[in-house]
Amino acid sequence: MPLSANFAPRENVPNVSAITYVRKLVFMPLSESPRASTHVRSGIPEATVTRLPMYHRALVAMAARGTALVSSEELATASGVSSAKLRKDLSFLGSYGTRGVGYDANFLLYQIARALGLTQEWSVVIVGVGNLGHALAGYPGFVSRGFNVVGLFDTDPNRIGETVVVGGADVTVADIKTLPAVMQKTGASIGVIATPESAAQSVSDLLVRHGVTSILNFAPVLLDVPQGVDVRRVDLATELQILAFHEQRKAEVALGSSNVG
């Protein structure tokens, strides 16, 4: 069966693209970073970890606009959380801001990027190059955050040999049989599964067997992985069902209000 899952700066910003500027900021060597001795705390709660990317995204936009200082209220609003929750989350990074002044936007961006592991580059492989796999491979947010797609794999003869533009470069879809060699060459530790449900577990087993320790799974199935392997599951249908629940609740409330009137 084919593996393709088919689903239809401070004051002045340098004269470069926002992505280039932010990459230069967050990938600066530790010795060149401001307050480089600041220690990133371990033991950050999982709930905080899930919100750090939201703060990172908001700060990237602010950095591109040249924002030097940002208050907790401003960043919280841009991230869709309460300012109290934001301050609590940032305290785990050792960042408390200055009362009446706020946070150094650039340094806070660096702190969050470092906590998320974005101050280094990561090699990623994608298995399943249908419509969804194509879209994932072409997503510019991967490259701008340090995720380099080093391999695209499928079993469909109609997909193998196809060229996909990834981060401005052409990457050829390879036969899944070549994955072990690519893994050995690139040392990729992150795998993305964009296959049908029936193929996901075997693909997961293959990835883990050849060095992947983190998996982003788009297949609608729970994967059985050994201890030490992290899996993040993205189930689009489940997310739509949750939205349907909220839509139904809103409709019920509206109906109740009209009946009262």
Regions found by a protein language model. Name each.
Residues 30-40, 250-261:
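Intrinsically disordered, low-complexity linkers and terminal tails enriched in Pro/Gly
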Residues 195, 218-220:
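Short secondary-structure boundary segments
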Residues 57-210, 226-228, 232-240, 245-251, ...:
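Hydrophobic, well-ordered beta-alpha structural blocks that scaffold small-molecule cofactor pockets
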Residues 2, 11-68:
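Extreme N-terminal segment that seeds HTH/winged-HTH DNA-binding domains in transcriptional regulators
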